[in-house]
Design a protein with these regions (language model features):
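Phosphopantetheine-dependent thiolation modules in NRPS/PKS and related acyl-activating systems
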Residues: 2-82
Length: 82
């Protein structure tokens, strides 16, 4: 799986959780760039991402995630472990 595939899947998850069809993500996208991406929705997003990609993040992993690119990298890292 590559970064673009992960990014595309994450876009679908973001649209579903935030109930907005016009969300466009790139590696530099942060919570400040997306209306409605707050701490509560962040946990919902992480939960759906973990289920979609069959990965688990520790609290420490989650705290380190600063943008969408970091999430993609974390997913790839977890996928390599399995």
């Amino acid at each position: 799986m590559d970064t673009q595939t992960i990014l595309n899947e994450m876009s679908l998850i973001f649209r579903e959780v935030l109930k907005r069809e016009n969300i466009v993500l790139d590696n530099e996208t942060t919570a400040q760039d997306v209306e409605g991406w707050d701490s509560l929705t962040n946990m919902q997003l992480i939960n759906k991402i973990e289920k979609k990609f069959n990965v688990r993040f520790t609290f420490r992993d989650i705290v380190k995630l600063k943008n969408v690119g970091d999430i993609c990298h974390a997913i790839l890292t977890e996928l390599v472990k399995t």
